[in-house]
Amino acid sequence: MGVLPVCLGKGTGLVSMITDWTKTYEAVMLLGTTTDTQDTSGTVLTQSAVEVDERTVLEVCSQFEGEYDQIPPMYSALKVNGKKLYELARAGVEVERKPRRVVINSLRVNDINLEDDVKTVTITVDCSKGTYIRTLCDDIGKKLGCGACMMSLKRTRVGDFVIDDTLTLNQIAALALKGEIEDYIVSIDEMFSDYRKLTVDAVYNRLLYNGNKLPLEAIVSDGGEFLDMEKFRIYDAEGSFVGIYKYIGGQFVLEKMFYDNSDT
Protein backbone atom coordinates (compact mmCIF):
# COMPACT_ATOMS: atom_id res chain seq x y z
CA MET A 1 0.00 0.00 0.00
CA GLY A 2 1.01 3.61 -0.34
CA VAL A 3 1.96 6.01 -3.12
CA LEU A 4 1.17 4.86 -6.67
CA PRO A 5 1.47 7.45 -9.48
CA VAL A 6 -1.16 6.89 -12.19
CA CYS A 7 -0.40 8.07 -15.74
CA LEU A 8 -3.17 9.04 -18.17
CA GLY A 9 -3.20 9.65 -21.93
CA LYS A 10 0.13 10.97 -23.21
CA GLY A 11 1.32 10.86 -19.64
CA THR A 12 1.79 7.10 -20.03
CA GLY A 13 5.06 8.05 -21.69
CA LEU A 14 6.29 8.85 -18.19
CA VAL A 15 5.94 5.28 -16.95
CA SER A 16 9.46 4.21 -17.93
CA MET A 17 10.85 7.28 -16.19
CA ILE A 18 8.79 6.82 -13.01
CA THR A 19 10.15 3.31 -12.54
CA ASP A 20 13.65 4.82 -12.36
CA TRP A 21 12.78 7.23 -9.55
CA THR A 22 13.93 6.66 -6.00
CA LYS A 23 11.32 5.55 -3.49
CA THR A 24 10.79 5.72 0.26
CA TYR A 25 9.20 2.95 2.31
CA GLU A 26 8.16 2.45 5.91
CA ALA A 27 8.48 -1.18 6.97
CA VAL A 28 8.08 -3.23 10.12
CA MET A 29 10.44 -6.19 10.56
CA LEU A 30 9.46 -9.18 12.64
CA LEU A 31 12.59 -10.52 14.36
CA GLY A 32 13.20 -14.20 14.99
CA THR A 33 11.16 -15.55 12.07
CA THR A 34 12.04 -16.33 8.45
CA THR A 35 9.61 -17.36 5.71
CA ASP A 36 9.78 -18.57 2.12
CA THR A 37 8.35 -15.27 0.85
CA GLN A 38 10.44 -13.13 3.23
CA ASP A 39 7.26 -11.61 4.67
CA THR A 40 4.61 -12.80 7.11
CA SER A 41 2.32 -14.02 4.32
CA GLY A 42 4.62 -16.95 3.61
CA THR A 43 5.33 -20.33 5.15
CA VAL A 44 7.52 -20.15 8.25
CA LEU A 45 10.96 -21.65 7.66
CA THR A 46 12.70 -20.93 10.96
CA GLN A 47 11.95 -19.44 14.35
CA SER A 48 14.77 -18.39 16.63
CA ALA A 49 15.30 -16.68 19.95
CA VAL A 50 15.98 -12.95 19.61
CA GLU A 51 19.07 -12.20 21.66
CA VAL A 52 20.13 -8.80 20.38
CA ASP A 53 20.15 -5.35 21.95
CA GLU A 54 19.18 -1.99 20.49
CA ARG A 55 22.78 -0.98 19.82
CA THR A 56 23.37 -4.10 17.71
CA VAL A 57 20.17 -3.48 15.73
CA LEU A 58 21.25 0.09 14.98
CA GLU A 59 24.78 -0.96 13.99
CA VAL A 60 23.59 -3.73 11.66
CA CYS A 61 20.96 -1.55 9.98
CA SER A 62 23.53 1.19 9.33
CA GLN A 63 25.72 -1.32 7.47
CA PHE A 64 23.14 -1.55 4.69
CA GLU A 65 23.33 2.12 3.70
CA GLY A 66 25.03 2.70 0.35
CA GLU A 67 25.48 0.25 -2.51
CA TYR A 68 24.40 -3.27 -1.72
CA ASP A 69 24.31 -6.50 -3.76
CA GLN A 70 20.86 -7.95 -3.21
CA ILE A 71 19.71 -11.41 -4.33
CA PRO A 72 16.11 -11.13 -5.62
CA PRO A 73 13.57 -13.31 -3.78
CA MET A 74 12.12 -16.42 -5.38
CA TYR A 75 8.66 -14.98 -4.87
CA SER A 76 9.05 -12.14 -7.38
CA ALA A 77 8.01 -11.38 -10.96
CA LEU A 78 11.58 -11.49 -12.29
CA LYS A 79 12.13 -14.03 -15.03
CA VAL A 80 14.76 -16.76 -15.36
CA ASN A 81 14.84 -18.56 -18.72
CA GLY A 82 11.44 -17.11 -19.56
CA LYS A 83 9.75 -18.28 -16.35
CA LYS A 84 8.66 -15.95 -13.57
CA LEU A 85 10.40 -16.74 -10.31
CA TYR A 86 7.17 -16.89 -8.31
CA GLU A 87 5.80 -19.53 -10.72
CA LEU A 88 8.88 -21.66 -10.12
CA ALA A 89 8.65 -21.08 -6.36
CA ARG A 90 5.02 -22.20 -6.28
CA ALA A 91 6.06 -25.36 -8.11
CA GLY A 92 8.65 -26.03 -5.42
CA VAL A 93 11.60 -25.17 -7.68
CA GLU A 94 14.38 -22.89 -6.48
CA VAL A 95 16.90 -21.53 -8.98
CA GLU A 96 20.08 -19.54 -8.60
CA ARG A 97 19.56 -15.78 -8.84
CA LYS A 98 22.30 -13.32 -9.63
CA PRO A 99 22.77 -10.50 -7.11
CA ARG A 100 21.65 -7.09 -8.31
CA ARG A 101 23.28 -3.85 -7.23
CA VAL A 102 20.82 -1.57 -5.42
CA VAL A 103 21.38 1.62 -3.47
CA ILE A 104 20.06 2.33 0.01
CA ASN A 105 20.30 6.12 0.19
CA SER A 106 19.26 6.12 3.82
CA LEU A 107 17.96 3.62 6.38
CA ARG A 108 16.47 5.16 9.50
CA VAL A 109 15.42 3.08 12.50
CA ASN A 110 12.21 4.59 13.89
CA ASP A 111 11.37 2.11 16.63
CA ILE A 112 12.88 -0.97 18.27
CA ASN A 113 10.62 -3.21 20.33
CA LEU A 114 12.55 -5.99 22.06
CA GLU A 115 10.38 -6.16 25.17
CA ASP A 116 7.16 -7.76 23.89
CA ASP A 117 6.73 -11.37 22.81
CA VAL A 118 6.52 -10.12 19.21
CA LYS A 119 9.82 -8.33 18.68
CA THR A 120 9.87 -5.77 15.88
CA VAL A 121 11.95 -3.04 14.28
CA THR A 122 10.34 -0.22 12.31
CA ILE A 123 12.46 1.37 9.58
CA THR A 124 12.23 4.04 6.89
CA VAL A 125 14.18 3.22 3.73
CA ASP A 126 15.03 5.57 0.86
CA CYS A 127 16.24 3.41 -2.01
CA SER A 128 16.86 2.97 -5.71
CA LYS A 129 14.57 1.15 -8.11
CA GLY A 130 14.61 -2.63 -7.96
CA THR A 131 15.11 -2.79 -4.19
CA TYR A 132 13.12 -5.50 -2.42
CA ILE A 133 12.37 -4.31 1.10
CA ARG A 134 11.36 -7.79 2.29
CA THR A 135 14.72 -9.09 1.10
CA LEU A 136 16.41 -6.23 2.95
CA CYS A 137 14.55 -7.31 6.11
CA ASP A 138 15.65 -10.91 5.54
CA ASP A 139 19.28 -9.84 5.04
CA ILE A 140 19.23 -7.68 8.17
CA GLY A 141 17.86 -10.66 10.09
CA LYS A 142 20.72 -12.83 8.85
CA LYS A 143 23.30 -10.31 10.07
CA LEU A 144 21.54 -10.06 13.42
CA GLY A 145 21.76 -13.84 13.70
CA CYS A 146 18.11 -14.33 14.61
CA GLY A 147 16.45 -14.04 11.22
CA ALA A 148 13.70 -11.61 10.25
CA CYS A 149 10.88 -11.11 7.81
CA MET A 150 8.76 -8.17 6.76
CA MET A 151 5.53 -7.68 8.73
CA SER A 152 4.15 -4.60 6.95
CA LEU A 153 5.13 -2.18 4.19
CA LYS A 154 3.97 1.25 3.08
CA ARG A 155 5.40 3.25 0.18
CA THR A 156 5.48 6.88 1.31
CA ARG A 157 7.25 8.49 -1.65
CA VAL A 158 7.87 7.97 -5.37
CA GLY A 159 10.11 10.67 -6.79
CA ASP A 160 8.50 13.99 -5.82
CA PHE A 161 5.14 12.38 -5.00
CA VAL A 162 4.61 11.99 -1.26
CA ILE A 163 1.85 10.19 0.60
CA ASP A 164 0.43 13.39 2.15
CA ASP A 165 -0.55 14.57 -1.36
CA THR A 166 -2.22 11.35 -2.48
CA LEU A 167 -5.90 10.51 -2.95
CA THR A 168 -7.61 7.26 -2.05
CA LEU A 169 -9.70 5.40 -4.63
CA ASN A 170 -12.86 6.50 -2.83
CA GLN A 171 -11.74 10.13 -2.93
CA ILE A 172 -10.97 9.86 -6.65
CA ALA A 173 -14.41 8.38 -7.35
CA ALA A 174 -16.12 11.16 -5.38
CA LEU A 175 -14.17 13.89 -7.19
CA ALA A 176 -14.97 12.32 -10.57
CA LEU A 177 -18.69 12.33 -9.78
CA LYS A 178 -18.48 16.04 -8.94
CA GLY A 179 -16.46 16.77 -12.09
CA GLU A 180 -13.53 18.03 -10.05
CA ILE A 181 -10.93 15.33 -10.71
CA GLU A 182 -9.03 17.44 -13.28
CA ASP A 183 -8.13 19.88 -10.51
CA TYR A 184 -5.90 17.15 -9.07
CA ILE A 185 -4.21 15.99 -12.28
CA VAL A 186 -0.58 17.06 -12.65
CA SER A 187 0.32 18.20 -16.17
CA ILE A 188 3.15 16.40 -17.93
CA ASP A 189 5.47 19.39 -18.07
CA GLU A 190 5.03 19.96 -14.33
CA MET A 191 6.78 16.63 -13.88
CA PHE A 192 9.91 18.26 -15.30
CA SER A 193 9.73 21.54 -13.38
CA ASP A 194 13.41 21.19 -12.45
CA TYR A 195 14.33 21.51 -16.15
CA ARG A 196 14.64 24.94 -17.75
CA LYS A 197 11.91 25.95 -20.21
CA LEU A 198 12.77 26.85 -23.82
CA THR A 199 10.52 27.97 -26.69
CA VAL A 200 11.25 27.54 -30.41
CA ASP A 201 10.61 29.91 -33.29
CA ALA A 202 7.50 29.03 -35.35
CA VAL A 203 9.74 28.24 -38.34
CA TYR A 204 11.08 25.25 -36.41
CA ASN A 205 7.75 23.89 -35.17
CA ARG A 206 7.68 21.11 -37.77
CA LEU A 207 11.22 19.98 -36.93
CA LEU A 208 10.22 19.98 -33.28
CA TYR A 209 7.07 17.91 -33.88
CA ASN A 210 9.05 15.38 -35.90
CA GLY A 211 11.62 14.94 -33.17
CA ASN A 212 14.47 16.30 -35.28
CA LYS A 213 17.58 17.88 -33.86
CA LEU A 214 17.22 21.60 -33.22
CA PRO A 215 19.98 24.15 -33.87
CA LEU A 216 20.73 26.93 -31.42
CA GLU A 217 18.98 29.49 -33.61
CA ALA A 218 15.69 27.60 -33.18
CA ILE A 219 15.44 28.87 -29.61
CA VAL A 220 13.75 32.25 -29.20
CA SER A 221 13.44 32.34 -25.41
CA ASP A 222 16.36 33.55 -23.33
CA GLY A 223 17.73 30.36 -21.86
CA GLY A 224 21.05 31.76 -20.74
CA GLU A 225 24.10 29.51 -21.01
CA PHE A 226 23.47 25.96 -22.20
CA LEU A 227 25.45 23.21 -20.49
CA ASP A 228 26.41 20.10 -22.43
CA MET A 229 24.09 17.15 -21.59
CA GLU A 230 21.62 19.48 -19.84
CA LYS A 231 17.95 18.60 -20.34
CA PHE A 232 15.24 21.14 -21.19
CA ARG A 233 11.46 21.38 -21.47
CA ILE A 234 10.81 22.41 -25.08
CA TYR A 235 7.65 24.27 -26.13
CA ASP A 236 6.43 25.15 -29.61
CA ALA A 237 5.88 28.74 -30.75
CA GLU A 238 2.28 28.59 -29.50
CA GLY A 239 3.40 27.67 -26.00
CA SER A 240 2.42 23.99 -26.04
CA PHE A 241 4.73 21.52 -24.33
CA VAL A 242 6.26 19.11 -26.85
CA GLY A 243 8.99 17.13 -25.14
CA ILE A 244 12.31 16.86 -23.35
CA TYR A 245 15.45 17.69 -25.29
CA LYS A 246 19.09 17.36 -24.32
CA TYR A 247 21.77 19.89 -25.30
CA ILE A 248 24.65 18.05 -26.98
CA GLY A 249 27.48 19.63 -28.94
CA GLY A 250 25.74 22.87 -29.84
CA GLN A 251 22.32 21.46 -30.70
CA PHE A 252 19.24 20.05 -28.98
CA VAL A 253 18.56 16.32 -29.31
CA LEU A 254 15.24 14.65 -28.48
CA GLU A 255 15.18 12.76 -25.19
CA LYS A 256 11.42 12.11 -24.78
CA MET A 257 8.51 13.12 -27.05
CA PHE A 258 5.06 13.93 -25.67
CA TYR A 259 3.55 15.33 -28.88
CA ASP A 260 1.32 13.44 -31.30
CA ASN A 261 -0.36 14.41 -34.57
CA SER A 262 -3.77 14.76 -32.93
CA ASP A 263 -2.47 17.85 -31.14
CA THR A 264 -2.64 19.88 -34.38
Regions from the PLM with identified roles:
Residues 3, 18-21, 55, 60, ...:
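Accessory RNA 3′-end/elbow-binding domains used by RNA modification enzymes
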Residues 1-167, 243-244:
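RNA pseudouridine synthases
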